[in-house]
């Protein structure tokens, strides 16, 4: 497969990479030297020779134990294992697990772009550098359409869609003020029993109980508790699930295969 070249205005060569700034004031200076990868942990995390763990910004790969996790880890290893990488930062350099958060390059290869384009990772809302959001979304659409990687066995792909995301309004205490509306955009009835719905975090996903959705019909997944109906499901959580500043709604079928990935920005709006 052809390499993905770093998009302009970043296509500058490694030498210039080490001294230039992108969008003055928005991006921190790049490191003075490349860093060697000593270990590939999973599909979106590596460890450097100095012991630091680097989490790839802007994407999520399947978690260990999930379908395709081994394939995603191998794809990442093929790209960066034992190689020198250049890290590009924007905004916070740390995430909640104290791993370094960065965009990663091997020569002129944009590692996140390769993983998404090959279908081994999905795009997330967390984009320290917004210039990559559209690029990664385009790669994901290409991978989805081509049925690559995690999208290869998505027989339900494109049939279930997100129509609305309503994060909880600040100050509201009712967890059911937060919800996601899904629609069956296909032509056949969908048996959603056992399907998994999750956000960008590593918290356990919502497992859909016995439930089916006819073509053209919608259902709402509320964060709080309530009685299930033909068009309403309840997660049973008390705390916020969907981040007001933006998040990603991911749905997998009962076999763990990816059905959809919907990223939204502040207030549930579509990202620009």
Residues covered by each model-derived region:
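Small beta-barrel nucleic-acid-binding modules, primarily SNase/OB-fold domains
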Residues: 3-6, 11, 16, 23-272
């Amino acid at each position: 497969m052809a390499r993905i070249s770093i998009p302009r205005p970043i296509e500058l060569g490694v030498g210039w990479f080490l001294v230039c700034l992108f969008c003055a004031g928005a991006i921190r200076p790049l490191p003075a030297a490349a860093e060697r990868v000593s270990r590939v942990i999973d599909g979106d995390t590596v460890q450097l020779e100095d012991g630091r763990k680097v989490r790839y910004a802007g994407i999520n790969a399947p978690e260990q134990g999930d379908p395709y996790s081994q394939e995603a880890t191998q794809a990442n290893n093929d790209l960066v294992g034992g190689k020198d990488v250049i890290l590009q930062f924007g905004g916070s350099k740390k995430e909640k697990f104290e791993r370094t958060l960065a965009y990663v390059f091997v020569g002129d290869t944009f590692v996140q772009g390769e993983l998404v384009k090959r279908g081994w990772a999905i795009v997330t809302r967390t984009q320290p550098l917004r210039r990559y959001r559209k690029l990664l979304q385009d790669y994901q659409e290409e991978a989805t359409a081509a049925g690559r990687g995690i999208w290869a066995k998505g027989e339900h792909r494109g049939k279930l869609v997100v129509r609305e995301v309503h994060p909880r309004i600040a100050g509201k205490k009712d967890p059911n003020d937060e919800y996601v509306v899904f629609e069956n955009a296909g032509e056949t009835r969908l048996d959603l029993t056992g399907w998994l719905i999750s956000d960008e975090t590593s918290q356990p996903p919502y497992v859909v109980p016995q439930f089916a959705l006819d073509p053209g019909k919608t259902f709402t997944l509320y964060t709080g508790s309530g009685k299930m109906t033909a068009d309403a499901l309840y997660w049973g959580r008390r705390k916020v699930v969907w981040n007001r500043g933006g998040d990603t709604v991911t749905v997998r079928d009962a076999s763990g295969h990816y059905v959809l990935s919907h990223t939204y920005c502040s207030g549930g709006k579509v990202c620009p």
